[in-house]
Amino acid sequence: MDIHSYMKKNGFIWGPEPEIYDGVAGFYTYGPNGKKLKNKVEDILRKNFTKNSIHEVETPIIAPEIVWKASGHLGKFTDPLIKDIKGGVHRVDKLIEDFLIKNNDSPDNYNLGSMNNKEFLKFIIDKKIKSPNGLELKKEIINHDLMMETKVSVDRRAFNRPETATMTYLPFKSYYEFYRKKLPFGVFQIGKAFRNEISPRNSVLRGREFTQAEAQIFYSEDQKKEIELNKDILKSEIPLWSHKDQSERKLKKNISIESCLKKSIFKSRAFAKAMHLANKIISEFGFPIERIRFRQHNPNEMAFYAEDAWDLEIKTNSQSWIEVAGIHDRKDYDLSQHQKMSNKNLEAEGSIPHIMELAFGTDRLVYSILDIFMNQEKVNNDNRIVLKLPSSIQLNKFAVFPLQKKDGLLEKAQEIHSILNEKYDNVIIDISGSIGKRYRRQDEIGTKNCITIDYDTLKDNTVTIRDRDTMVQKRIKIKDLK
C-alpha cells in the first residue's frame, strides 16, 4: 500500500478538499488519527519552546498591504514557473528534482537552491528535460507570486500571511514592555499560513494552506555573541552538512557545538543554541539518526540579509530528503524594515535587536512520521501493515477488546477501559470483528498494546496483552497493566 492510500484509509489525511466537489489541490483535512498525531507533534514543539522560556502568542492571519511591502514579500515572494507547449505550468526546481530522481541521480549533487532562472533554463535545455507527461517546455521561466490576496472592508488591499514569522515580529513593542524591557526574550506561535503554490502535490508536503510552528528569539548584537552555553550544549553533536561539504560532494558529519564555534561553522553562540534546540526537538520524534541532517544554505542561496541559515531535513522513504524546519540568523533586518515603514521606534537597549528563528512545518513532520514508521511485512503468508510509532508520539497506548459482546465481557471491557482512561489519555475500546482483524486494525494505526478480555478474565482478573512490534502475547493481572 502506498503512503497516500494508507493515510486516507486509516483516517490520517483526506483530500484534496472539498472531495465532494472534486477537491482543490493543496487543501487537506486531518482525520481523527491525523489530528491526534498532529497534536502530538505540536505538543512536543510547544513543550520544548516553553521549557526554554520561549512563550506562545497568537497573531492575526491577515495583514494590510503595507506590512508585506515592509517585509519584502510583496512582488518578491515568488517561485520559478515554466510552461509546456500545451499551457501546463510547472514549478521549475521541483520539475528538475523529479527528473533527477527518476534518472537515478540525486538532487544533492546539484546546488538547485542557489540557481537563478537563467541557470535553471540552461540546466533544463542541457538535460533535455520535458514536462511530467512528456511535453516540450517553453524556453522561458517566469516568477509566480505566492501571496494570497484578499480585501479588508470594501476595498482595502490585504494578504494572507505566507508564514507566521512576519506577524510575530509586529507586536515587538508590546513584547518589550511585557518582558520588562530586557533582552533576550523569545516568543513562538503555531498557526496557519497560505501560499498560492503553482503545483501543490505529495499530500501535505506542499499545500496551499499549512501549519507552521515558528519561534523568534530577540537578542542585542552583543548578546548574540556572548551568551552562556552550558557544558551539555557544547559537548552535544549535530549531524551537519555544510555548504563546503556539499560543494565537495562529501557526506554529513557529526560535529560538536563546541567545535562548530571554534571552527566558525556557527557565527554566534546564540545561533549555536538555536541549532542545539532544533536538534533536541527533532530527536524527541524518534527518527533514526541516519535520517536526520542539517543542510547549510549555500552563500548564493541564502537571503541577502541573513547571517546564517540551515535547513533541518529528514530522509523519507517516498520523497528522499525533505525540509521540515529552518534555523536562521535574520540579524536586525525584519525589525529595521518595519521601523522604517511604520515610523515607529523598534529599538531595545539602544539598538534594533537581532532575531534567531526556528521555523518548523508541522504538516511535514506528520508526513515524515507516517512515511518512515509505516512498515509492511509478511506474517504467515499474510500482509501486515504496522505503524511502529515511538512512545513519544504513539496515538494509543492500549486498545481494549472484549472477546464477545455478551456474557458480561463487554461490560468488563468497558470497566477496564474506564480504569485505564483514568491513568492515560490514549486508551480506546474496539468491539467489532474478529480478534485477528482487530489486531491488524490497531497495528495499522500504531496502537502499542492490545488487551483481550475473555472468560478467564471474569474468573481471575487476568487479561491477554499483545505487543504491537513483537506480536508476543502474555497473560497478566489487570492491576499490572501499565
PLM features per residue range, with description:
Residues 1-482:
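NTP/phosphate- and nucleic-acid-binding module
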